[in-house]
Amino acid sequence: MTNIRKTHPLMKIVNESFIDLPTPSNISAWWNFGSLLGMCLIIQIATGLFLAMHYTSDTTTAFSSVAHICRDVNYGWLIRYLHANGASMFFICLFLHVGRGLYYGSYTFIETWNIGILLLFAVMATAFMGYVLPWGQMSFWGATVITNLLSAIPYIGTTLVEWIWGGFSVDKATLTRFFAFHFILPFIVAALAVVHLLFLHETGSNNPIGLNSDADKNPLHPYYTIKTALGFLLMFLVLLSLVLFCPDMLGDPDNYMPANPLNTPPHIKPEWYFLFAYAILRSIPNKLGGVVALVLSILILAIVPFLHNSKQRSMIFRPISQCMYWLLMADLLTLTWIGGQPVEHPFIIIGQIASILYFTIILILMPLSSMLENKILKW
């Protein structure tokens, strides 16, 4: 008799995706981040649901309701800090997942890659709106500054901003709609993640050497489920260390002050995971130019597959491209650092150089490196 997991309509889908899935035998720990992102999403939805039970999306009570969660709700502090630091873990896993895709040439699965970019935008939107909800100083001013950027769009900009605000400034209407969107978006992210997996399973996984692995595959379970379990364990170790020992390390002290429209904080900055994009935005003196650069800093990932001109898929045997890749990583770390610094000399010029370098590496230096390596292969 055939096993029920192979015949039952629902279990068959689970079986083909998570149990009998043919997986390349040589994939490394870098292939763990997809499942870690799934776990992050589950943690965020679960903790977020319990937070939503006690949170009130009203400007007069939002800040107090978050304080009430931390002080009066059973393990409320734990749920709140798991949610806040869970977002940081989410972005760490996201950046490593995208970095892996760039290094090993996974972007040649164009549909999977493009849905991944959509997922990145959706998660960034969710995180931004979530940061507004505690209604602290940085929540309010972050929302004001970032939504105000849309006013740079010619002709419809101002109308668009007021439409998003639901008035003439960030106020009660804005907070209420941001809460509604913040609640619904993770479910849209979950649906997109299913589509992401669907397209991935059409082609099968890439592997470190970037060659066809049809001749050498293993079932996902038990060979990779055990590696996934170890990944979960390590992620929980880092997350719980953050939550239990230094829960506010990645946050901003200004957000412990209630939102005050009459008092601007000395340095308005977003959460650490947006700092690289914020640095690119600030490095351009023109408002519209800054907004375009901000969007392009992420959207540039969509043209990476078309810039790939190497005879090899992965970077594992391409030392010049590897140098360019690690230069890009160093540049992103520099941008992240600059995004958290005040707008003054020498940070302005460092940010501008790092921003130019970011686009130059991706658009010019990486394709040139590939061409050079192709030439070397012929010699």
UniProtKB/Swiss-Prot annotation:
SUPFAM superfamilies: a domain/subunit of cytochrome bc1 complex (Ubiquinol-cytochrome c reductase), Transmembrane di-heme cytochromes. GO terms for cellular component: mitochondrial inner membrane; respiratory chain complex III. A ubiquinone binds at H201. Keywords: Electron transport, Heme, Iron, Membrane, Metal-binding, Mitochondrion, Mitochondrion inner membrane, Respiratory chain, Transmembrane, Transmembrane helix, Transport, Ubiquinone. One of its GO terms (molecular function) is metal ion binding. It is a multi-pass membrane protein. Gene3D superfamilies: Cytochrome Bc1 Complex, Chain C (1.20.810.10). Belongs to the cytochrome b family. Component of the ubiquinol-cytochrome c reductase complex (complex III or cytochrome b-c1 complex) that is part of the mitochondrial respiratory chain. The b-c1 complex mediates electron transfer from ubiquinol to cytochrome c. Contributes to the generation of a proton gradient across the mitochondrial membrane that is then used for ATP synthesis. This is Cytochrome b. The gene is MT-CYB.
